Regions:
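Conserved beta-strand termini and adjacent loop/short-helix elements that scaffold enzyme active sites
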Residues: 115, 139-141, 192
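Conserved catalytic-core segment of NTP-binding enzymes
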Residues: 64-66, 72-133, 233
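ATP-dependent carboxylate-amine ligase catalytic core
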Residues: 1-73, 91
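Acidic-glycine-rich active-site phosphate/pyrophosphate-binding loop
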Residues: 15-16, 134-144
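Short catalytic-loop micro-motif centered on adjacent basic/acidic residues
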Residues: 32-35, 112-114, 199-200, 226-228
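Alpha-helical scaffold segments in soluble metabolic enzymes
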Residues: 18, 22, 43, 47, ...
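Nucleotide phosphate-binding/pyrophosphate-handling subdomain across enzymes
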Residues: 55-58, 66-79, 83-84, 97, ...
């Protein structure tokens, strides 16, 4: 249950069952019945509220504009990570269409931090910010701090995280440095065995695979590599 975490501690199975049961009491009376993701989103909101969390990081399920998580009317900051071709059946067949869905999380008069994007994607984000009078910050460099994660793209991700943290009250530069050097990201270029050396990565779209390829070439370029790929058909 790693999708529900408070201070790096996963929600227990008992707590998960408790909150889903509470949500089900309401959901079972609704037509149409909420999807499992919508129910889990509602359970997460209730869980974080009752645990009195100071700051909550909510990750969109898919897209953004029509996602269940986007029910939040106002946020400290809306974060847009690199946009590439993904979930085309639901989000659109062009980068512009997908960017339109992703930029739907931008709030009126809000703050937006975006990673480096293709020009056509950035244009969509800028237009959305203009329409909603939102302030846009472009984290289009790489972090200068030491990070724990391998891969040059992780330095780009870290730059986004830095900008976000700088706009949250109570987070110092020292906190940011410590956070980056102690970050753990399971399933993203993660070594799970040394003999033989075994790396797992959850890349599931073109951009993710390209980034994985770059990391493999950088760290294992001169070695024989065996690939095992799983695809959900």
């Amino acid at each position: 249950l790693e999708q529900f975490r408070i201070t790096a501690e996963n929600m227990s199975e008992d707590r998960y069952a408790y909150y889903i049961s509470r949500i089900s009491e309401v959901a079972d009376k609704m037509t149409p019945h909420p999807t499992p993701f919508e129910m889990e989103t509602a359970a997460a909101f209730l869980y974080f509220k009752e645990e009195q969390c100071d700051v909550v990081l909510i990750e969109v399920g898919m897209g953004g504009r029509e996602d269940a998580t986007n029910i939040i009317p106002k946020s400290l900051v809306s974060v847009i990570t690199p946009i590439s071709m993904d979930h085309m059946k639901f989000l659109g067949n062009t980068l512009e269409e997908i960017a339109y869905q992703k930029s739907g999380i931008i709030k009126n008069n809000g703050l937006v931090v975006t990673a480096k994007q293709e020009n056509c994607v950035m244009n969509v984000i800028e237009n959305e910010c203009c329409e909603k009078n939102a302030r846009l910050i472009k984290a289009d460099n790489v972090t200068e701090y030491e990070i724990s994660l391998d891969g040059e793209y992780q330095r780009e991700n870290a730059a986004v995280a830095e900008e976000v943290c700088r706009h949250i009250d109570g987070v110092s530069e020292n906190d940011i440095k410590n956070g980056l050097i102690n970050t753990v990201w399971h399933g993203r270029f993660e070594k799970i065995c040394d003999k033989p050396e075994f790396i797992i990565d959850g890349a599931h779209n073109i951009d993710g695979v390209k980034r994985l390829k770059e990391s493999i070439e950088k760290y294992y370029g001169n070695r024989k590599i065996v690939y095992i790929t799983g695809v959900f058909a």
